[in-house]
Amino acid sequence: MQSIQTVSENTIYVGASDRRLAKFENLFPIPRGVSYNAYVILDEKTALLDTADASVGAQFLENVAAALDGRKLDYLIVDHMEPDHAAMIEAVLVRWPDLRLVVNAKTLPMLKMYFPTDGAAFDDALVVKEGDTLDLGKHKLTFVMAPMVHWPEVMMTFDTTTGTLFSADAFGTFGALEGALFADEVDFAGKWLDDARRYYTNIVGKYGVQVQAVLKKAATLPIETIAPLHGPVWRKNLGWFIGKYDLWSRCEPEEKAVVVLYGSMYGNTASAANALAAKVAAKGVKVAVHDLSCIDNSEAVAECWRASTIVLATPTYNGGIYLPAANLLEDLKALNLHDRTFALVENGSWAPMSAKLMAAKIGELKNCTVLDAKVTVRGRLTATQDAELEACAAAVAASM
């Protein structure tokens, strides 16, 4: 059964959601699933903007056919070549062989790489560049190059008639759609924002400079609707979500807040982390606490983007950093986290040294500060260490 929805005048949503996939990119847990969005514009000429993942291929093709309602498909616009959006290109070409592909110069080599048998269609492709326009009749589409947001060939398509920005992976989020298509129809801040932050920080976070460049381009466009390739479509309160992207891409904390991230084998480091968190909270500071062994690394990364101060509490393990914390620090470096304050808690039954090792890793991050006040636990926290905890808590609160 087809499942299509109207986005705006003669623009139809033809995507589909997958609730079976356990991990996005086989890396990031998505307990709420994910949507693969695609759109059809009906005019004197028809256009399909992107395809979908193979997992929803049958539903996607049925939706496209329903939207076209017997009409031929004139154009397939490829904004992004990642297989979760491009997997069905070959199937679309088989079903509508007379269509013309619309791509940019960086897309063509990828098309030939992923679909080596479709040379004729690729040779006839319309290759567009920044500012080029495709006239469908009433709808005029302008192309905005968005390299490395988050692949080199990415572009966005702006419908000047409806003010719709088809934004590729930008402004996307984890989470399958639940009937409602639009962000204003759901509790986005309550139910979707954490997934949107986790999506941005782990998928796009490394490319903040490139996102900033695209935001500057977007600021010159009269955008009424943002139609991403994942998650709800935005037609109201666009400035709020664009503001989030501006913060995230500048790696500026969303909140003056503390996140305590700890690893603990037998509960002793956890006890110290919780004791420190309580002292910080008592000073009127907003605090969140997470066990790194119980949350996915992608969630910890997102929390580090959200909060202004990060407390890492870990035992020494094989003379090194407890592995969940070590993995987090490697990811933070790879994703270019910067401008944060860190406080450290270490534990070791005979040679505590994780604080020194973590500080060295944090030193590889741009403009990050490690507070002098740290807590060293030998086996388990004792009552005599209350002053040490208090000093660390005071330093954390002062860092706000």
Regions found by a protein language model. Give the residues of each.
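Conserved beta-strand hairpin/beta-sheet module of binuclear metal-dependent hydrolase folds
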Residues: 4-66, 156-159, 163-167, 269
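Metallo-beta-lactamase
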Residues: 5-9, 102-154, 210-213
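Active-site metal-binding motif and surrounding structural segment of the metallo-beta-lactamase
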Residues: 44, 55-102
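Structural motif
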Residues: 45-47, 75, 139, 163-166, ...
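Active-site neighborhood of phospho(di)ester-bond hydrolases with catalytic His/Asp-centered motifs
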Residues: 49-51, 73-81, 101-104, 165-169, ...
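Short acidic active-site motifs
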Residues: 88, 296-300
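Active-site-proximal loop/helix segment associated with metal-binding centers of metalloenzymes
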Residues: 150-154, 162, 170-205, 249-253
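FMN-binding flavodoxin-like domain, especially the glycine-rich phosphate-binding loop
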Residues: 177, 188-226, 230-233, 275-290, ...
